[in-house]
């Protein structure tokens, strides 16, 4: 199995509070099952707020209920209360990965950066060299996108 991504994929860095937009507003931030379990078992002052804002939609997906179209953990300075308080490893997969995306196809995994992110778009448009894609062989024994990451529940507990 091969993994293919733009050659500058790993160079992306979120500019967080300096971003002209926020990825923490105007869309449903889905909470993956591992994060949900960790949030429900969390023993921290922030746990009560986490439990209060998690909702389940008609499809059975858990998400953070927005407040005025914004994530309830988005602070006035544009930074995330969860990340600030519990660390980056505490973020649900949606927040941890965006603007990165990953698609598992029959014989390969394709990765990229969403141009919905102003910094990812700026990085692409600022290129002077042609865009190239890098493919590397990866183990194909039951590969699941994101499985290389440490389990969130292990980090929070």
Task: Give the residues covered by each predicted segment.
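Short loop/turn segments that flank or connect secondary-structure elements
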Residues: 1-49, 55-69, 75-157
């Amino acid at each position: 199995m091969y993994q293919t991504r733009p050659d500058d994929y790993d160079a992306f860095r979120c500019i967080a509070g300096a971003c002209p937009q926020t990825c923490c507003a105007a869309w449903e931030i889905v909470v993956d099952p591992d994060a949900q379990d960790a949030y429900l078992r969390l023993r921290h002052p922030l746990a009560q707020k986490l439990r209060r804002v998690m909702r389940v939609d008609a499809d059975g997906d858990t998400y953070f209920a927005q407040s005025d179209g914004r994530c309830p953990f988005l602070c006035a300075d544009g930074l995330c209360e969860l990340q600030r308080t519990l660390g980056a490893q505490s973020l649900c997969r949606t927040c941890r990965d965006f603007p990165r995306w990953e698609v598992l196809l029959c014989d390969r995994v394709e990765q990229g950066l969403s141009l919905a992110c102003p910094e990812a778009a700026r990085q692409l448009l600022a290129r002077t060299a042609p865009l190239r894609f890098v493919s590397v062989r990866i183990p194909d024994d039951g590969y699941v996108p994101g499985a290389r990451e440490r389990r969130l529940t292990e980090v929070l507990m």
